[in-house]
């Protein structure tokens, strides 16, 4: 009986979509983006070839050439592989949009975004966070990188218990909190209770971003991230597989992205741990 292993390599891009010029990272346009090809070109300048023999044997170089019409010696075109290039039709470039479309549900609507770079969140959201967590306020309230904002507010968070709240160019509301000083279960409870309000604004995800450490030792994010995503409004691949009487397994954040609907087994961990789990099922 056939099985399918669908692996999404996050941010391993092989060329921008036709509408890439409409999307940005900060002030930088996504037009011309091609992560794998650009890495190969950079490594070539350093005199250190990019070695991806397994991926090339599966057709990576062929896919890149088809995508952008550029062939690189470290990404050779293969005549003995089955490959394809997908062109996303969903409007967003966020995680739910891409994963849902891969699973058969293109996102044809516009997500809402917190566009203000500072003071990003409405007072109603901040009030709800305070009521749920019993705190006097929040930290952050801006666009930020997860690592940088923990460095900026980690110590004050530990001292005050005020959660660190931030967003990005994606349709997300992220909350970082110390696993012991604030409490992991408390963070999960906050995100779970807050998510209906956030989803009602058409924001795709609330993300719990737990971390550990101290000011002296440094801060580190843990593997206990949890995404509270909107429920897919229509059936997706996982639902069809389940309806056919088969078992479904998810690793990493996939279960969260699909709201655990029709997921039989869900495994989380580091990237290495997750790949080991994948190998155990091959």
Spans of model-derived segments:
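…; additionally, a secondary subgroup of soluble metalloenzymes is captured
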Residues: 1-282
């Amino acid at each position: 009986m056939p099985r399918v292993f669908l692996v999404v390599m996050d941010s391993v891009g092989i060329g921008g979509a036709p509408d890439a010029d409409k999307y940005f990272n900060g002030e930088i346009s996504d037009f011309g983006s091609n992560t794998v090809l650009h890495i190969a070109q950079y490594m070539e300048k350093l005199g250190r070839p990019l070695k991806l023999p397994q991926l090339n044997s599966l057709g990576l170089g062929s896919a890149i050439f088809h995508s952008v019409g550029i062939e690189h010696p470290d990404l050779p075109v293969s005549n003995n592989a089955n490959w394809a290039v997908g062109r996303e039709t969903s409007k967003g470039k966020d995680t739910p949009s891409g994963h849902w479309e891969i699973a058969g549900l293109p996102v044809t609507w516009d997500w809402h975004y917190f566009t203000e770079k500072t003071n990003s969140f409405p007072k109603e959201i901040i009030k709800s966070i305070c009521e749920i967590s019993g705190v006097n306020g929040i930290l952050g309230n801006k666009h930020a990188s997860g690592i940088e904002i923990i460095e900026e507010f980690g110590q004050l968070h530990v001292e005050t218990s005020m959660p660190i709240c931030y967003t990005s160019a994606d349709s997300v509301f992220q909350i970082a909190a110390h696993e012991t000083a604030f409490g992991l279960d408390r963070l999960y409870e906050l995100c779970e209770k807050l998510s209906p309000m956030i989803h009602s604004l058409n924001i795709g995800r609330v993300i719990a971003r737990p971390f550990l450490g101290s000011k002296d030792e440094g801060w580190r994010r843990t593997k206990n991230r949890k995404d509270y995503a909107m429920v897919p409004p229509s059936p997706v691949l996982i639902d069809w597989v389940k309806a056919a009487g088969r078992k479904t397994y998810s690793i990493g954040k996939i279960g969260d992205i699909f709201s655990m609907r029709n997921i039989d087994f869900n495994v989380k961990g580091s990237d290495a741990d997750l790949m080991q789990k994948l190998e155990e099922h091959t």
